[in-house]
């Protein structure tokens, strides 16, 4: 069986996108894990599915990590989906509904931007496994600043790029 998909890249992340408006497919964790595998599948960081809504220029997007779990908003993935939908429907603005909330997207001079909203800094909103100061999280020799923009992020400030080589992620 042929299953149509779109493969897109955004700032170092790659995505497999299924347009469930035009070609609905059933996707479960097992399917997502299989197609996300870089050796045995297509390979990606996340799988995104576009769902229809009753509101014009609104689209629902479900986002899944490569382990099959549903996740909150991803800015790079949202921009990729918005770019695809804007080209498909000749739009310059649209709204994407995610489990993290509504994400307004615009296109100006062929550049797609998304308003991810305000960052969340409370350890429970990120979420971290235990209560701690999110503005000073120790990662071996580095200090991180933790926040959520729909999914968890850790920001590490460095004096110079040479320090990047010492960072073992």
Residue ranges, per PLM feature:
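A glycine-rich beta-to-alpha transition motif near the start of alpha/beta enzyme domains, typified by
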Residues: 1-110, 155-169
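ATP-dependent small-molecule kinase catalytic core of the GHMP/sugar-kinase superfamily
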Residues: 90, 97-158, 162-166
């Amino acid at each position: 069986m042929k299953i149509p998909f779109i493969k897109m890249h955004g700032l170092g992340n790659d995505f497999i996108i299924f347009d469930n408006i035009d070609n609905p497919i059933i996707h479960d964790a097992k399917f997502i894990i299989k197609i996300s595998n870089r050796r045995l599948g297509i390979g990606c960081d996340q799988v995104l599915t576009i769902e229809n809504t009753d509101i014009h220029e609104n689209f629902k997007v479900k986002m899944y990590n490569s382990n099959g779990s549903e996740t909150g908003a991803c800015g790079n993935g949202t921009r990729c989906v918005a770019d695809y939908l804007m080209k498909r429907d000749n739009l310059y603005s649209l709204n994407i509904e995610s489990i993290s909330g509504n994400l307004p997207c615009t296109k100006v001079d062929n550049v797609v931007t998304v308003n991810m909203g305000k960052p969340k800094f409370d350890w429970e909103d990120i979420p971290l496994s235990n209560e701690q100061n999110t503005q000073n999280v120790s990662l071996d020799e580095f200090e991180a600043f933790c926040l959520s923009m729909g999914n968890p992020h850790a920001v590490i400030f460095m004096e110079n790029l040479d320090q990047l080589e010492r960072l073992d992620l």
